Amino acid sequence: MTWSDIGVNFTDKRLFFEPVFKRALTADVSHIIITGTNIDKSQQAVHLAQQYPHHLSATIGVHPHHANEFGDETLNKLQNLANSKSVVAIGECGLDFNRNFSTPDQQLFAFEQQLKLACELGLPVFLHERDAFKAQVELLTKYRKTLKGGVVHCFTGDIEQMNRYLDLDL
């Protein structure tokens, strides 16, 4: 049996890429998706995935903690990065009203822009949600008909909220 890992932070300097990647392959992990959390990390994720196209793919996006960095230039860079064959999703994106490293308004703006981009490109989303269920589900519901799908990678809710995400086919 082989395994896939859908959210590895190989762009984190604390995680030594080569030995971890080699151990993963030895442990029958056949495919890994590297998570992009801002423009720099998204560029790094794409670069790594291009080096190992049979084993690595990338997500590109802006994590809610970095939403204060999101603007027109960010959106343009994400659109350009999306041209890479290694890009399989938009994210890690979403809302985090627990830590609030970016304001809720900044997070809502960045999240909605990334949802629009995912819809335009026909890509799924890689989602993060912490203590922001209502606002996140409202935006997801707004775009769900044109959104290709996605996965809720981080969420702090209860079973009822989990079922609501499942009702959205996420």
Where are these regions (language model features)?
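Mid-domain alpha/beta scaffold segments of enzyme catalytic cores
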Residues: M1-L170
